[in-house]
UniProtKB/Swiss-Prot annotation:
Protein name: ORF3a protein
Membrane topology: Multi-pass membrane protein
Compartments where found: Virion; Host Golgi apparatus membrane; Host cell membrane; Secreted
Listed result of changing residue 34 to A: Complete loss of O-glycosylation
Amino acid sequence: MDLFMRFFTLGSITAQPVKIDNASPASTVHATATIPLQASLPFGWLVIGVAFLAVFQSATKIIALNKRWQLALYKGFQFICNLLLLFVTIYSHLLLVAAGMEAQFLYLYALIYFLQCINACRIIMRCWLCWKCKSKNPLLYDANYFVCWHTHNYDYCIPYNSVTDTIVVTEGDGISTPKLKEDYQIGGYSEDRHSGVKDYVVVHGYFTEVYYQLESTQITTDTGIENATFFIFNKLVKDPPNVQIHTIDGSSGVANPAMDPIYDEPTTTTSVPL
């Protein structure tokens, strides 16, 4: 117990000899004991500090975070708050164990530990999703699904809300305001353009992997909308190894999803026939 107390305590722990007063050989029922434990850090101030951190953490959710460094800073702060909460939980639990008052709070601590385990499992699952998507975006965004495709230059991973039958990827040419940069946009999320699209994209979730095939490309002459190109993907019902693709010259064939993209830099003259 002393080892754990010294490990999980800020400051120092003073272990004092047990002192029992008012005890007599005839009557030991009314004896009073002194807890042989004294922490140099005021526990109340630690709890108040973590409470303020939790309030500040909740307040930051109302602030618009658009840039990646802002999202990374917020997620890092959130992770530190969770670690502090776990520290306070273990610290207070060990103090109650040393005081012999653990039984009254056992169910409360069991609930807290259960919630902490869920949070830890969620972090592990997000890391696994990062590995599947080959990107750090699952750690930055809270979306449950991500639209991914991979080229020679870049691994794209854009947050997505749910599994749908159709996905529309909007390519901005960097001319329209207020966005003066080339990017790909899906449902309010965007990622800078580093290379072109592929003939298929994959929606990754915790236990989901759905393939979508490129069906058509709509340019300004098709839609009347300037400075944007739309790539329309439809959900595949076939097995992933047998993806039917449409090449630029109109021929069709069977390709493996691991193949290189047919084109890497779509232009305003690029059109994929249905």
